[in-house]
Swiss-Prot record:
It comes from Methanococcoides burtonii (strain DSM 6242 / NBRC 107633 / OCM 468 / ACE-M). InterPro entries: DnaG_primase, Primase_DnaG_arc, TOPRIM_DnaG/twinkle, TOPRIM_dom. Forms a ternary complex with MCM helicase and DNA. Component of the archaeal exosome complex. Residues 282-381 are annotated as: Disordered. This is DNA primase DnaG. Pfam families: Toprim_4. PANTHER family: DNA PRIMASE. Its EC number is 2.7.7.101. Residues 319-374 have a biased composition (Basic and acidic residues). GO terms for biological process: DNA replication, synthesis of primer.
């Protein structure tokens, strides 16, 4: 009999015979042809009596004068003995009067099957049988977390602004909108946060941002955008992070918070993304426009003052004509010289025409050409990297160069940080169509990169002496 409690392996084999055979014939052939083959320790009859071999199961069928089927032998032997026993079955070449062939197809580990069943059952028990207790335990855990968060919250400045415990000591801080945002970030271990309490940024926060690396983390709505605009005017911000569209920072879970902070962008790039630069331009352009108008107004006032004496002289002329009434026709003759004035004007118009033609052929165009030829005055470093810089304009791409200024690799600007971290192929220069930020500059210094060429510089607090930075203004 098969002892299911001690079965470790099941030997799977298939049999084919040139004739019609039945189960007793196959079982008899197995016992008969393996008897004495492997010695007394592995004799099938003795192993079955002691329970180390279970009941031999046979499933066969006859079709077209031939028999095919499967044989299953349970075993509680170890792996070596089970393998020897399985190999001995393949030595059987006849079953009854028919030629037969047995082939081992699989040795199944019963314990592995049991382990799979245990895992599946445990999943079911965990998900279905513990559901009733989860809400109550979750409420207890939330209550404990809430009490810990309230104890960890501190207050900064005279206005007692809610903040995390590490705001003063940390080199980098996260600026959020309200007290609930600080609590939510404390819940997930982010302790260097401080809130602004709306669009009216407290002076303490504005002063604190000048001393640290600041990331503004706001809601994914219009209010969050307004807070960013306010911070850009009164505070010093390095990076901007936004919650997903339509969500608030206080409602985010840990995965969403980490993703949003990892996707932060430099403030220079955010100015273009959130169209803050376009809103700020009219403010700068209006002031010079007003100044120019103010300077023009005095000129317009001076001109009518000059015309007033001319108007005053006109009434003096008719006074002379009144003294000589008969000579009133003479002014008409004097009006004829107006034709001469017209002639003079024609002469004057002719002379400018003659002067205009040489003006068109004059050297301003020639003078413009040397203005375009200014690259001759560029520094040797700028001339060295100008071909790469010109080729990358508008592509948002980057080139990694070796000591001979040959291209090692090309990548996108958004992947430049990861590429520099992973690449150790002797990069000496990096030319890219983007902003030179503090992060890229630090990585370049760590990697031994000598030259960084970008569109413009970001908010750089520390510039390593070992890295030479060039921007579009150098070209």
């Amino acid at each position: 009999m098969q002892n299911t409690d001690t079965t470790k392996y099941i030997i799977h084999s298939k049999i084919s015979a040139d004739g019609i055979i039945e189960r007793p014939d196959i079982v008899g052939a197995i016992f008969g042809q393996t008897e004495g083959l492997l010695g007394s320790d592995l004799d099938l009859r003795d192993l079955q009596k002691t329970g180390r071999i279970g009941r031999i199961e046979v499933a066969v069928g006859a079709k077209g004068g031939k028999t095919k089927g499967n044989i299953f032998i349970p075993s509680s032997l170890d792996r070596v003995e089970t393998s020897i026993l399985a190999a001995s079955l393949e030595t059987i070449d006849r079953v009854g009067p028919c030629a037969a062939k047995i082939e081992i197809t699989q040795v199944e580990d019963v314990r592995a099957t049991k382990r799979k069943h245990i895992i599946e059952r445990a999943k079911f028990i965990l998900t279905d049988m513990f559901d009733e207790n989860l809400p109550e335990s979750q409420e207890i855990a939330d209550e404990v977390r809430q009490s810990v968060r309230i104890e960890e919250m501190q207050y900064y400045g005279k206005n007692k602004i809610p903040c995390g415990p590490n705001v003063v000591e940390s080199d980098a801080i996260v600026v959020v909108e309200g007290r609930a945002d600080v609590l939510n970030l404390l819940r997930y271990g982010i302790k260097n946060t401080i809130c602004v309490g709306g669009t009216n940024v407290p002076p303490e926060v504005a002063e604190l941002t000048k001393k640290k690396t600041v990331t503004a983390f706001t809601d994914g709505d219009r209010g969050g955008k307004l807070i960013i605009k306010e911070l850009l005017q009164v505070a010093d911000i390095d990076y901007i992070a936004r919650a997903p569209d339509g969500k608030s920072v206080e409602d985010l879970v840990q995965r969403e918070i980490v993703r949003s902070l990892r996707q932060k962008i430099p403030v220079e790039q955010a100015l273009e993304n959130y169209t803050i630069k376009t809103d700020a331009k009219p403010v700068t352009t209006e002031t010079p426009a007003k100044g120019s108008r103010i300077t023009r107004l005095p000129k317009r006032k001076e001109r009518p003052e000059l015309s007033v004496p001319a108007v005053k002289q006109l009434p003096n002329k008719p006074s002379r004509s009144e003294e000589k009434p008969g000579v009133t026709r003479e002014p008409r003759t004097t009006r004829e010289p107006r034709t001469t004035r017209e002639a003079r004007t024609t002469r004057e118009t002719r002379s400018p025409r003659e002067t205009r033609s040489p003006r068109e052929t004059r050297s301003p165009r020639e003078t413009r050409e040397p203005k375009e030829a200014k690259p001759a005055m560029l520094s040797p470093q700028a001339l060295r990297f100008k071909p790469h810089s010109d080729a990358l304009i508008g592509t948002l791409g980057a080139r990694l160069l070796d000591s001979k200024d040959e291209i090692i690799e090309e990548t996108a600007v958004r992947d430049l940080v990861n590429t520099l971290k992973e690449n150790d192929e002797g990069i000496k220069s990096v030319v890219f169509d983007g902003v030179v930020t503090q992060r890229i500059l630090d990585i370049a210094s760590d990697k031994g990169i000598e030259n960084l060429i970008g569109v413009k510089k970001g908010n750089i607090a520390k510039s390593p002496a070992s890295v030479n930075v060039l921007t579009a203004s150098d070209f």
